[in-house]
From Swiss-Prot:
Name recorded for this polypeptide: Coiled-coil domain-containing protein 154
Xref: PANTHER family: COILED-COIL DOMAIN-CONTAINING PROTEIN 154
Keyword hit for Coiled coil: yes
Keyword Coiled coil: yes
Amino acid sequence: MSELADSGPSGASAPSQLRAVTLEDLGLLLAGGLASPEPLSLEELSERYESSHPTSTASVPEQDTAKHWNQLEQWVVELQAEVACLREHKQRCERATRSLLRELLQVRARVQLQGSELRQLQQEARPAAQAPEKEAPEFSGLQNQMQALDKRLVEVREALTRLRRRQVQQEAERRGAEQEAGLRLAKLTDLLQQEEQGREVACGALQKNQEDSSRRVDLEVARMQAQVTKLGEEVSLRFLKREAKLCGFLQKSFLALEKRMKASESSRLKLEGSLRGELESRWEKLRGLMEERLRALQGQHEESHLLEQCQGLDAAVAQLTKFVQQNQASLNRVLLAEEKAWDAKGRLEESRAGELAAYVQENLEAAQLAGELARQEMHGELVLLREKSRALEASVAQLAGQLKELSGHLPALSSRLDLQEQMLGLRLSEAKTEWEGAERKSLEDLARWRKEVTEHLRGVREKVDGLPQQIESVSDKCLLHKSDSDLRISAEGKAREFKVGALRQELATLLSSVQLLKEDNPGRKIAEMQGKLATFQNQIMKLENCVQANKTIQNLRFNTEARLRTQEMATLWESVLRLWSEEGPRTPLGSWKALPSLVRPRVFIKDMAPGKVVPMNCWGVYQAVRWLRWKASLIKLRALRRPGGVLEKPHSQEQVQQLTPSLFIQK
């Protein structure tokens, strides 16, 4: 009791650090403490505590877990001290019960002695009735015997009062111990409830952080996708702009070339008119003798000159075709590089590149056709205008210079396009590497999270699989305790009934002897003796009523235990279903096997006694053992119904009666 009183304030100093204690936790702790006299180690306590709380240990920081385990060690030490005190109290109660039994045996022996003395008095009173002359000395002997009987009755009364005081003292000690244990368990319940709330808050914060991180990753991925799409649109717009600029530049160059060709044609026409007039004048002057000579000389000269001009024009046309082919090859390279770079971007860029290639090819074909037409026209004009080649040489030289300028501009444009293509390729490679790094990081985080979740679920599954073995061990211990307590209660009840019957018989014999004495020798002392015997009988009746009241109180307690057990089973089933509805999608399929083990009967039930200060967790041994017997019988029946089950002996009538649910209501 002193250890309980000392450990009470230490347990009450931290009422806001633990969560609500569950019935399985207290059952495992106290059952282990009752079964093993050695102190529990930290590893066993951690395993038992983690088995009862598998989902809340992952969210507590390391410092909080260290403090929590230190507090758990202190509380377990206090609980072991309380269990030791309860064992000592149990031993004291057993010793007091043995002493009461010895005193009752002594009282019985004394009553037997008194009965034997009364019988001796009766035997002595009979010859006294036959011999009235010896009445006076025998009456004095009878008075002495009555005084001795009074003294013995006083001793019996004092022994009964001592027994009553001891019972009251033991009852008070038991109630005090129960109240202290109830207070300690209530405080521990409050502390554990507060810790459970803290852990739930921590779990919520952790889940919120995980959701925020996943949301941030999604936002980052969306932003990267938007940047990539925006970059692709910008690149496509730049290519379109440059394509439009190139087309405009080519169109302008072709228009300028066409204007120059028209100007050269107009100048040629003017020169042709002037030369025609000059030739007509000369033809008129030299129409005579020099006509044939001039024609021959002019024909030779014109043929040679025209051949040179045709060769120059052929070289210019070949250079122009070569330039056009180089331009086409460079454009084809650009298109091929663009097609390779944008192959992953979709068919839209490919279609655009194809259209651009077709457009450039059409422009090149148009340019080639225009060149061929121009060459044909130039050949036709050369056939018709052999004399006007000098003016055309200047125009051809001018065109060659312009073509050289164009050929000088085209490499610069191609180099710029190559540089821009390289820059775009570098940017795309950087964006691709960043995207791959972010994706790799997210995949690594996801794999790490999955690995942690699988490890945590594996640990939870192992702990949940170990729960049925622990519950079965506790059930076996409860069965042993119940069998011992039933044997003791039955033996004590039979002994008390036998003693009460013996006392009643002795009182009946004593009353009959007193009645005989009253009939033989009426007197004041006989009346006093009868009154004392009546008071003694009243005291015995009160003792019997007290025993009956204790029996009714025990029956009421057992009934309340049964009712509260059914309520606790219903609430436990609701909580298990709610927990499964919340945690079911994240729990593996293997944990379904551990679900029936969670719905097993609880060893502790709440006893809302009106005489107690606070609600108290009491050990319902009687109903627990009945439930365990019922469960064992049901398990045997289920094993018999299975196809591979081993056949056993049929249940006796006593076991069948134990299976009836009315036993939970009776006692």
